[in-house]
Regions:
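Electropositive, glycine- and tryptophan-enriched low-complexity nucleic-acid-binding patches
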Residues: 40-50
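Active-site beta-loop-alpha junctions of metal-dependent nucleic acid enzymes
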Residues: 48-70, 82
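Domain-scale segment recognizer with a strong primary affinity
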Residues: 1, 89-217
Length: 217
């Protein structure tokens, strides 16, 4: 009997070149409630949504919100759960031009970033349960902000800095200038503000001249 040819190794997901080019998503349950986590594979910036009803409708709503904030991703990696394979999700991804990469037993590593994000999300949730056993939402979101500002142990750069070019304000006192944008951006913003101010002055002068002419009639 002839030996069967060995199967080809699974094609690995491509390496991202910029924030939110490639994202990964997964669902998990914590204390009887469903959550969806979506993570950017470039910066490891996580988004964590509570899903009251679950299902594709809520997932699509989460993606729509993310795409309008961070831009439309080229590809999303998920497992084969029905919420990801459902017709509503597939139609949304197709309409927005997003490729869907499904993980499998042979290619489980393609969604490992989402699985890591789930562990981190559960840790954040666990650490912010109040004395009554309920999630302290303010404390949780502050912890999420802090996590996004925490430098990666390997790259030494935080998710926030990779996405925005600076840390985001999380309520922790910082030295002056910590949240300032890049100098080149500041110069462009200053030029824009000067141009706006100039237009306002010209507009005011024209309006004043027009009013004066009316009074002269």
């Amino acid at each position: 009997m002839a030996k069967s040819n060995p199967s080809l190794p699974p094609y690995p997901p491509p390496e991202p070149e910029y924030p939110f080019q490639y994202i990964a998503a997964d669902y998990f349950t914590f204390r009887g409630k469903d959550y969806c986590v979506v993570v950017d594979r470039f910066s490891h910036w996580p988004e964590i949504f509570m899903s009251q009803q679950g299902g594709s409708k809520r997932f699509v709503s989460c993606l729509r919100s993310m795409f309008s904030t961070f831009g439309v991703s080229e590809e999303i990696s998920t497992d084969g759960a029905s919420v990801f394979k459902g017709g509503l999700t597939q139609s949304f991804l197709r309409d927005w031009g997003v490729k869907h990469r499904l993980s499998s037993v042979a290619n489980a590593h393609s969604n490992c970033r989402a699985e890591i994000a789930v562990k981190q999300a559960k840790r954040l949730l666990t650490d912010n349960i109040d004395d009554s056993g309920q999630l302290d939402r303010d404390a949780f979101h502050r912890a999420l902000l802090s996590y996004r500002n925490t430098p990666d142990q390997f790259t030494k750069v935080s998710p926030a800095k990779l996405v925005f070019g600076r840390e985001v304000r999380d309520g922790v006192p910082m030295i002056p200038g910590k949240y300032s944008p890049h100098e080149a951006w500041k110069e462009a913003l200053d030029a824009r503000e000067k141009a706006v101010a100039k237009r306002q002055v010209l507009g005011h002068e024209k309006w004043t001249e027009h009013i004066y002419q009316i009074y002269q009639l």
